[in-house]
């Protein structure tokens, strides 16, 4: 059964098959999570088998909520499914909208609810190899520099978050600690 995501069609929010939303460049809902340990962020390299942006580095996890699923529930679900992470408190940080070509004729036009969570760097992580190639902790400012110097290694959305929305996302995190 195809995965149905919330997308806007003719101004109405309705369930649309995920691949169709990307093929048509429809504006759709998404979530992104950043797990932080102080000034370090856990990032993941997307699995080679992903249908877009395979092998590129992204934030801790990101996905689309299922039709009828709350964004906060989706964030917790994907931390568990992609990385085996449970028990973290995710806090809504901001909402960002962007549109980006992700290759192979696919467009991400997302309205993204962004969540942050604090964790120790020794947090147990068990990546699902279908989703995640590898993970690493990196200082947030080092990551921003790395993205600027080697943008081809990173997903379009991570580049956008760090270039255009870093203070909006991570400034609020410092208040949460």
Curated annotation (Swiss-Prot):
Chain residues that bind Mg(2+): 82
Predominant location: cytoplasm
Binding positions (Mn(2+)): 22, 28, 64, 108, 110
Span of domain Nudix hydrolase: 26-160
CDD domains: NUDIX_IPP_Isomerase
Active site: 62, 110
Pfam family for this entry, one: NUDIX
Cofactor: Mg(2+); Mn(2+)
The protein's name: Isopentenyl-diphosphate Delta-isomerase
Originating organism: Cereibacter sphaeroides (strain ATCC 17025 / ATH 2.4.3)
Taxonomic lineage: Bacteria, Pseudomonadati, Pseudomonadota, Alphaproteobacteria, Rhodobacterales
